[in-house]
Amino acid sequence: MAEHVEGPLYYETMGRTGPVVAFVHPNPMDQSCWMFQMAQLSTWFRCIAIDIPGYGRSPKATKGLTMRDIAQACWEAIDDAFPGESAILAGCSTGSAIAPHMYHLRPDKTKALVLCGTGYNPRKEFAHHRIKSYQDRGVDFRWDYTFQDFSPAFRTTPLGHYFANLFAERNVYADADSIIYQFEALLQPEAADHHSAIKAPTIILSGSEDGAHQSAFALKDRIPGCEMRVLGGAGHACQIEQPGLFNRWMLEFLGKHGLMPASPKPMM
């Protein structure tokens, strides 16, 4: 079992045939932020969306949590659902930070990386601000924080409020200390070759209205052969705001690298 995690992570699956795609969510959301991807990609793939420690319905973390611990716990969830299987790893924000650690744990089991809401920010100043917000407000901060993951236009929509309410309704299961430990883990230094040693096919899908968008180009340059597409008008959680385009580009990328089942043909 992964260290500093008080039990197996909660996950949900969709799809019964095809390669495995594992989705890892951003802060402050949970696995349901991938509902649009799970619904469509389950036509071709066995999908698993995982709640990381302290979010959704996963157990708490303890002090000393590392990114490697979270990555190990995510692989254990995949092993529980699909024993012995390789996986395509998809992450948003925090999930995109976890995915490379998952790759380094099992490079032979990682078929590809699909990253969004991400960039290269070695100083990670944002983490200190998030820690203070959770210390001051606890899990109630999650509702306001959800809107920061959206573009200004999407924040005012009924769907934006739907997602904010969806995640906040699960605050009874969330744990502020665990979320703080996750940000502390994120602040730990990475190996010099953390990105340059990635050999799996990788794509960054970046929203033009994401605060991390400009730093996504720097991350692209650090990962060998990394591809990138920009979703115009989308924010940090671009997979929620523009699921049709996000899914299309994800499927095109997987097809390009021989990871897409031959039938049925996607409606591109």
Residue positions per predicted region:
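Gly/Ala-rich beta-loop-alpha elbow adjacent to hydrolase catalytic centers
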Residues: 91-95, 99
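Active-site loop/oxyanion-hole signature of alpha/beta-hydrolase fold enzymes
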Residues: 39, 48-90, 248-251
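Flexible "cap/lid" loop of the alpha/beta hydrolase fold
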Residues: 100-105, 109-141
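Catalytic active-site module of serine/aspartate enzymes centered on a nucleophile-bearing elbow/loop
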Residues: 226-268
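Conserved alpha/beta-hydrolase catalytic His-Asp/Glu region
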Residues: 124-126, 140-196
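Short beta-strand/loop motif that positions the catalytic acidic residue
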Residues: 198, 204-206
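Conserved alpha/beta-hydrolase "acid-adjacent" motif
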Residues: 211-217
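Conserved HGGG/HGGXW glycine-rich cap/lid loop of the alpha/beta-hydrolase fold
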Residues: 7-59
